[in-house]
């Protein structure tokens, strides 16, 4: 029997790298009856982490999609179908998080009660804001030394700028953590240890916590009163709200991103996870609660699709994975209509038809074959040929292109070569497949040295790629030293003439252009404007000029790095009836750009990383001194239970080998995280050294 749409929840579980997200997901699968034995990350047996590298490293890399059913702790709901996308918390895999947020309706964000809101949590939060994803928070690890629930709540307010509404308070903390208090029911919940928390009982609130509970319940009532005028009147007249009224109000406020309900517990100790599942059903949206999906039709006009089985089919492919048994799996989210296996769909981004063979639904790494996928659901199709991440699949007669996802450019590159000649071809195939799965990973061949260069979002990202080549494709590779992906840009506007003329018997070559080259704001990218009037250059030659400029931009003008953020206007030129050709105009455009760019104050840009170091106070001086030596700019400092937190912006070029240096400077007691922040102009002495090397 198909589940009605209002009983669906498509959610992600997102968190910082060690907040205990995979353990939380595992418990969800256990309590919803999908897995009969609890898998622990510590034993390398977690169901969701199904790539060998994940089990070894104890972190989650691929986001697996899993389906489970839940009808409430007290069996108080109809059976709801929850699709969970497990997302990695390590910043090198931010792209995976970004992709999954794009197709989710809601998220559970897990925080560690000791570490609180960490830098990656802020990144995930910003990404969720960007896609307008409603969320609830689970403050996990309440049994750890130094657990402090209310500190995390105040960080959500201050660091993330959100409005948390506390729905539960912990009973005790650290070793003494016993259970939680439900502030809406005003009852304490104790989970039974014998059956891993499968059953629980409501008891009265401990006397010493009564006053605190009253105070936090008052905050909930205050928040709920904002929902409607009736509730506001009740509130002002001091009348009690019913449980249903509070929940209805909070649901609306959560879905519209005005508040964030906060739960607490310890997944590892089997306390609190079922209450979070109830929260998913009560406060997170179903596919019918979210706005209609927007897209454009083949003429570029905006169109909407409702989440309904009666609309034409549309879906977004959000992940490609290579499965050892079935080949290429394309994970997609269906937004409208119904897709049956055997149907033909249209990939509107690539303009190609695809026949859908088998359709699968995933439970971590086991799979179930299904006959159809309906609007609002998440599934995987086997063996699609042309689909890459971010493509739209739709009805052939009712074409729609859903919005594209934008992926960041890689910031780090290394050269790889196979250990044996025999592996050369295998390596090419392996890298091709991995690049198809992961849009933030690029592969190209360096034209001068003939080396294969792989680029990604960080050292760990590339290490894992090399590791996967070895594991999944049996290709052993030697890896060069990491190289920074520099860029070039221009600081001044210039006008430049470019002429390419060859006369040597027979047909000649003639191309002549005038370009205005000007800098754009950082991040604006390249823009080409055709301002030719009166046909001084025939329009069939214009694209060739654009192509010539872009090729020259790829090759750089001062140090061979790509030129970015430039606007080029083609405003004049001339042609020859016989000798002009696309080739001649392409060369003219390319040469003209190079000559002009050299006069336009070209500069070198380097990637700057946001670095956050957590260090015991004793080593603070050494850490700061070291960051300054690495050309770092300290942005701020604050206290945390683990010592001091230092935030700085440091050029990537200075950060290689930092983990080893930091370990030795602090006897292994400091930790750091880093993520890409922006490109900035490199100081003259640094730029000169890099240009000389080229």
Curated annotation (Swiss-Prot):
Q: What is this protein called?
A: Elongation factor G
Q: Which gene encodes it?
A: fusA
What is the organism field in this record? Legionella pneumophila (strain Paris)
Family membership, please give it.
Belongs to the TRAFAC class translation factor GTPase superfamily. Classic translation factor GTPase family. EF-G/EF-2 subfamily.
- HAMAP family per the record? EF_G_EF_2_B
Residue positions annotated to bind GTP are 15-22, 86-90, 140-143
Q: Which Pfam families match?
A: EFG_C, EFG_III, EFG_IV, GTP_EFTU, GTP_EFTU_D2
GO terms (molecular function) for this protein are:
GTP binding; GTPase activity; guanosine tetraphosphate binding; translation elongation factor activity
* Domain tr-type G: start-end pairs: 6-288
